[in-house]
């Protein structure tokens, strides 16, 4: 599964935006405990820099907000790949259990769920329906770290 996952990301055209997992403060980009992989909230960071900043519905338009989501979920999936490359455990199965999307939006914004659909769709494309379908939360926020428009975190089962 370890090399298959990375090959699948490449074959599906999932861009790798950073050479290694990134954390912007005193935390780990991911944590593995008891067969569960917790991916810290990912911002739309490309080559170590925030690609977009501002509020969705104001400075950030629909296309840019969708791009933010795809960058965040790509960063999540590449963090999973990095974990798989560095673990010594034998892994047979990876499933996405939960996805949480936080959106820095103007007050009247209502399409949080539609934005998070972009992330859910990519995860299902990579893992398949059986292992990719997940529970999730999409929520609007008054602000996010670094004035990021989007932050997404994920939880995976690793068996």
Residue ranges and their predicted role:
Residues 1-97, 105-159:
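N-terminal presequence-like segments and the immediate start of the first folded domain
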